[in-house]
Swiss-Prot record:
PANTHER family, alphabetized: RNA HELICASE
Protein's UniProt name: ATP-dependent rRNA helicase SPB4
GO molecular function: ATP binding; ATP hydrolysis activity; RNA binding; RNA helicase activity
EC number in record: 3.6.4.13
Residues in Helicase ATP-binding domain copies: 35-205
GO biological process, one term: rRNA processing
A Pfam entry, by short name: Helicase_C
Length: 463
């Protein structure tokens, strides 16, 4: 991707100097294509691979407007940036904080009373999530009456996370006479519909022929082998591992930690915002592993991540792109690996049809650990987490967006039970017609304890 210096862009001179001093002087392709159009007052719809510098592509024109005096000194807010996740909002505020502007962040999980107090202060940029911004704008509409710039970052996810109704209400409350930008790594019908309704003759900017920031490799493994391969390939690397559910993150982070892997961080939507902020800061500063759900898949810039592992097939195929974008950022190297169980092979072809090519990895299993080796590490606390993780995974799998492609009946349920190191199979409607060879299920009256069948209780190694 070609780059030029900031000196090639016509914008405020003092801002150029500060951009250079803050390490953004070498402009990326998306910045060079986007910034001039926004400075001319044009709306833009930008599709660019994740990790290519979209944040500065929309912040630079906003900052230039403020530095030129068009936003500074005028009453109210100059720009609003809407994001799908709290962490992305906090990161954008952090980048804006490098410059001579005041930027406030309004996100869920924080005190609304404190937000109302901050609204009484003067600031130029408001960044936040749709729900909290809707509350703020609804109470202080006048403060946003002079708005000149609006940005929807990760626009496809703003529509896909269930924010659509709140987003539409929020946009309806903001002034129409503004410059609007939609930014995302993927573009779908919902984004196009949104642009037709709220943008005026937008300039379409598409950077990069391939949405994927790195080549996607896949490894065909049984459920239990997923854990063994994970423990093998993450050794000594700075890695992010994505799971389907919060309970899986809790269980596997605890298990891998007991297996001797140091500095394991975990993030998911059920963790408090203060704790999420602390964990992000810890992982940002230290090497190690981050186990998470898709809450960490969008926009967050973790430098030096050289491997992304998709432990579970994501519900939305576009998540592959955004997850993979946590590595190979801004030209650095990285890898993205998808674990595919035998019943999920059709998913690889589905990805190819969606423009996300995947190649089978040459990796060969070489783990020295066995099922019994890892099982011996299971504590009573972890055993409790394992049942919750198993139940959440089964339900998530049955409700998968492409369940018609994933062969639920073809799942190796015995290996899946081993992956979660179950002592008994929990009673679940989703397992009513499932037969286990190595485990017995509870009787319908719930009185029968389901333990591994006798012939499988002996020590066994995973081949």
């Amino acid at each position: 991707m070609g780059c030029k210096g900031i000196e090639d862009v016509a914008m405020n001179g003092r801002l150029k100097k500060e951009i250079e001093e803050n390490g953004f002087g070498k402009m990326t392709e998306v910045q060079l294509k986007c910034i001039p159009e926004v400075l001319k007052g044009k709306d833009v719809v930008v599709q660019s691979p994740t990790g290519t510098g979209k944040t500065m592509a929309f912040l630079a024109p906003i900052l230039s407007c403020i530095y030129d005096g068009k936003g500074r000194g005028r009453p109210g807010v100059t720009a609003v940036v809407i994001t799908p996740t709290r962490e992305l909002a906090l990161q954008i505020r952090e980048v804006a904080g490098l410059f001579d502007v005041k930027c406030e962040c309004f996100i869920g999980g924080m005190s609304i009373e404190e937000d109302y107090k901050r609204m009484k202060e003067e600031f130029s940029i408001a960044v936040g999530t749709p729900g909290r911004l809707l509350e703020i704008v609804g109470k202080e509409t006048k403060k946003f009456s002079s708005l000149s710039h609006l940005v929807l970052d990760e626009a496809d996810k703003l529509l896909g996370f269930g924010f659509e109704e709140k987003l539409m209400q929020l946009l309806a409350k903001l002034p129409r006479n503004r410059v609007t930008g939609l930014f995302s790594a993927t573009r779908n019908d919902s984004v196009d519909k949104l642009s037709r309704v709220f943008l005026r003759n937008p300039v379409s900017i598409n950077v990069g022929n391939n949405e994927m920031p790195v080549a996607l490799e896949y490894i065909v493994v049984s459920p239990m082998e997923k854990l063994l391969v994970l423990m093998d390939i993450v050794t000594g690397r700075r890695c992010i591992v994505f799971f389907a559910t919060c309970s899986e993150v809790d269980f596997f982070s605890g298990l891998v930690s007991r297996a001797g892997f140091g500095n394991i961080c975990k993030i998911h939507g059920k963790i408090s915002q203060d704790e999420r902020n602390r964990v992000y800061e810890e992982f940002f500063q230290r090497d190690g592993l981050l186990f998470c759900t898709d809450v960490a898949a969008r926009g967050i810039d973790f430098r030096g991540v050289d491997l992304v592992v998709h432990f579970d097939v994501p519900k939305e195929y576009s998540s592959i792109v955004h997850r993979s974008g946590r590595t190979a950022r801004n030209g650095s190297k990285g890898e993205s690996v998808l674990f595919v169980m035998p019943n999920e092979r059709a998913y690889v072809e589905f990805l190819k049809l969606k423009g996300i090519p995947a190649v089978e990895s040459s990796y060969r299993m070489k783990s020295s650990l066995s099922y019994q080796d890892i099982k011996s590490m299971i504590s009573p606390e972890l055993l409790g987490l394992s049942v919750k993780a198993f139940v959440s995974y089964i339900r998530s799998y049955k409700e998968h967006f492409v369940s018609y492609i994933l062969d639920y009946k073809g799942l190796d349920f015995d290996s899946l039970a081993e992956l979660f190191f179950l002592e008994r199979i929990p009673g679940m409607a989703e397992l009513r017609n499932v037969k286990f060879e190595k485990f017995t299920k509870p009787a319908r009256d719930g009185k029968k304890r389901a333990l591994p069948k006798k012939k499988y209780r002996k020590k066994r190694a995973i081949k």
